[in-house]
């Protein structure tokens, strides 16, 4: 049976925990901006008229424009530069998941964010030295950003009352959805007016400013924070009594491997990032093939799904908490409902995009809905691990994120293979494969998912390897 949480309400939107969630929202916007900006500035950085006539060296660049130096990097080198940040993020997930329960989150996130921002500032200089150095910089950024994105889940183990987990986590994580929309809007303007190096300087400086505020605002334990009212401290502490101490014990690896609810979460994370990556990475390609618009209009249209995904993500978290606070559905039912919506609706709207869209507006509408509806998973499987095992939440998030990233990388590769082999029927094959993966994941989740603390995650357990 689901946990029964205290129904009394504490201070809400004027409370410090919501200030913290909003701050993490902006922090995640900065992180995703630093991650994405190279993909957009690469258009200005590369000499597209001479990709095959010169070797891949940064020394061979146009000297007539010091504000916008241009390099002769082949598409292969560009691909390595693009992917290098994901290798760093991929490698760090499980180590960060483990040490987050041991070391200070304030120091871990703060130093990682500062290093990522510092590297961003030095990327133009690295590009001038050689493509090897920019690859190294991006790997380091992947490691530091992977640290921030995974370790931040530990914040809500101590700061989020059970009845507010959905809205607090969705508020903070939705920064990853709004960030791309902002980046797509401002990066082109900065490149044209100030030069592409200023993109890295600006986002790096923003990261340093956010890092400074982080060290001032955040405390690992709300009980120690001087700006949190006594009433709010008591509310948070009393609401978290049922989950027990958050002190890390030895990891119950065997119990985790045997846990079907954890496997259900893992499958859904794989399906979510498969869907999200396929929809986001290939949205510009799909728009170009269906609407044949110019690149500037394509960029604007491609940014709209991010905006609506952000709106849906925030709505999902608030709605999930509303249903739970009113006892309208059990927590397990809520998690299953939002996961099913987030994985099944993209299938419906993607098929509508292929077979029912007959004009510009219907195509864009179905495209936005297919992207945005996946954000309902923020109220479902994506935060379900916090219900099952608060003590090991960040470690589990590291593992499930690693599994999900595998789905994301595989999705892009498979979609590329389909598009290169059979452009005529490729989109149907891509959507069909996504449908199969999502449906299987939802069925498994509906059968095995739970939302109460598992026996192996309770304080009395001392399961060892």
Curated annotation (Swiss-Prot):
Keywords: Cell membrane, Glycoprotein, Ion transport, Membrane, Sodium, Sodium transport, Symport, Transmembrane, Transmembrane helix, Transport. GO terms for cellular component: apical plasma membrane. Glycans are attached at residues 47, 56. GO terms for biological process: monoatomic anion transport; phosphate ion transmembrane transport; sodium ion transport; sodium-dependent phosphate transport; urate transport. The keyword Membrane applies. It is a multi-pass membrane protein. It is found in: Apical cell membrane. It comes from the Eukaryota. Kidney cortex and liver. InterPro entries: MFS, MFS_dom, MFS_Na/Anion_cotransporter, MFS_trans_sf, Pi_cotranspt. The chain crosses the membrane at residues 79-99, 109-129, 171-191, 198-218, 255-275, 304-324, 337-357, 363-383, 399-419, 428-448. GO terms for molecular function: phosphate transmembrane transporter activity; symporter activity. The keyword Membrane applies. It catalyses: 3 Na(+)(out) + phosphate(out) = 3 Na(+)(in) + phosphate(in); urate(out) = urate(in). Important for the resorption of phosphate by the kidney. May be involved in actively transporting phosphate into cells via Na(+) cotransport in the renal brush border membrane. Plays a role in urate transport in the kidney. NCBIfam families: 2A0114euk (TIGR00894). Belongs to the major facilitator superfamily. Sodium/anion cotransporter family. This is Sodium-dependent phosphate transport protein 1. It comes from Oryctolagus cuniculus. The gene is SLC17A1.
């Amino acid at each position: 049976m689901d946990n029964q949480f205290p129904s009394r309400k504490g201070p809400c939107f004027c409370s410090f925990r919501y200030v913290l969630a909003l701050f993490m929202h902006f922090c995640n916007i900065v992180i995703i901006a630093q991650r994405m900006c190279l993909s957009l500035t690469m258009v200005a950085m590369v000499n597209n008229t001479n990709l095959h006539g010169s070797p891949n060296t940064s020394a061979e660049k146009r000297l007539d424009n010091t504000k916008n130096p241009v390099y002769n990097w082949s598409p292969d080198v560009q691909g390595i530069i693009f992917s290098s940040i994901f290798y760093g993020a991929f490698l760090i997930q499980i180590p960060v998941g483990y040490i987050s329960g041991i070391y200070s989150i304030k120091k871990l996130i703060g130093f990682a964010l500062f290093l990522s921002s510092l590297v961003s500032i030095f990327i133009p200089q690295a590009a001038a030295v050689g493509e090897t150095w920019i690859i190294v910089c991006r790997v380091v950024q992947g490691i530091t950003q992977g640290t921030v994105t995974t370790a931040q889940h530990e914040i809500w183990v101590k700061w989020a009352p059970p009845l507010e987990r959905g809205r607090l986590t969705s508020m903070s994580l939705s920064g990853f959805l709004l960030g791309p929309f902002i980046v797509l809007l401002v990066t082109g303007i900065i490149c044209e007016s100030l030069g592409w190096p200023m993109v890295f300087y600006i986002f790096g400086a923003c990261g340093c400013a956010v890092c400074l505020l982080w060290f001032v605002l955040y405390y690992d334990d709300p009980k120690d924070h001087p700006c949190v009212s006594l009433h709010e401290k008591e509310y948070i502490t009393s609401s978290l009594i049922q989950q027990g101490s958050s002190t890390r014990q030895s990891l119950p690896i065997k119990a985790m491997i045997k846990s079907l609810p954890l496997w259900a979460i893992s499958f859904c994370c794989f399906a979510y990032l498969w869907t999200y990556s396929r929809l986001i990475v290939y949205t510009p390609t799909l728009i170009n093939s269906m609407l044949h618009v110019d690149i500037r209009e394509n960029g604007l249209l491609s940014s709209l799904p991010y905006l609506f995904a952000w709106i849906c993500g925030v709505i999902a978290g608030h709605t999930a908490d509303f249903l739970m606070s009113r006892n309208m559905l059990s927590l397990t039912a809520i998690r299953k409902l939002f996961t099913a919506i987030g994985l099944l609706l993209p299938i419906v709207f993607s098929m509508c995009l292929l077979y029912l869209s007959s004009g510009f507006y219907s195509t864009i509408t179905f495209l936005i809905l297919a992207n945005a509806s996946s954000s309902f998973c923020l109220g479902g499987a994506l935060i379900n691990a916090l219900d099952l095992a608060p003590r090991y939440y960040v470690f589990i998030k590291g593992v499930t994120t690693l599994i999900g990233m595998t789905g994301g990388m595989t999705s892009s590769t498979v979609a590329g293979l389909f598009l290169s082999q059979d452009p005529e029927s490729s989109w149907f094959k891509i959507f069909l494969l996504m449908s199969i993966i999502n449906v299987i994941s939802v069925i498994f989740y509906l059968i095995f998912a739970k939302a109460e603390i598992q026996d192996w995650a309770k304080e009395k357990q001392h399961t060892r390897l």
